[in-house]
């Protein structure tokens, strides 16, 4: 937006930030957002820090595109879709917050890359500054920042014995 004031926010939403888990079944953040009672906005951010990352190939980006198309096909009967933004994550959320009131952000906890860990720390700070709750769900049985494995096997058992987190798609407003 250049020289244009953002409109007053008119709708409060729960944002589900889709990162690597591009599915609608067994998706804890989606279930939690739907249970919040607020309309759910599904968001995928194409981040510049990932475009040049050697962990992401053309096939990876093709998979992401196809997965989002598949999700949108599943959501079409409910007149909603994944919103895709190309930007840094904090800037993308800031742009959304100019148009909508973000009640909370729901996502999976991303693991494995230093650049996404640093990005998540920035997001945590941004959410804190904006008084927006960020609810991260564990990815599998990995515990981010674990310095020992004393409780790991108990945690693994609990995670893998838990029932699927499924949401009725018609509850995503």
Region spans (language model):
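Active-site "lid/cap" and pocket-lining segments within catalytic core domains
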Residues: 2-173
């Amino acid at each position: 937006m250049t020289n244009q004031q953002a409109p007053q926010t008119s709708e409060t939403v729960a944002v589900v930030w889709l990162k690597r888990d591009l599915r609608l079944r067994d998706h804890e953040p989606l279930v939690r957002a739907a249970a919040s009672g607020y309309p759910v906005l599904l968001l995928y951010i194409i981040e510049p820090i990932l475009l040049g990352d050697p962990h992401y190939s053309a096939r990876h980006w093709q998979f992401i595109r196809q997965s989002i198309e598949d999700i949108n096909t599943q959501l079409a009967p409910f007149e909603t879709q994944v919103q895709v933004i190309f930007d840094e994550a904090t800037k993308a959320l800031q742009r959304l917050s100019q148009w909508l009131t973000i009640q909370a952000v729901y996502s999976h906890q991303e693991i494995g890359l230093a650049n996404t860990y640093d990005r998540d720390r920035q997001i945590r700070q941004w959410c804190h500054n904006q008084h927006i709750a960020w609810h991260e769900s564990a990815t599998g049985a990995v515990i981010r920042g674990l310095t020992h494995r004393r409780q790991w096997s108990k945690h693994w058992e609990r995670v893998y014995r838990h029932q699927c987190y499924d949401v009725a798609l018609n509850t995503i407003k």
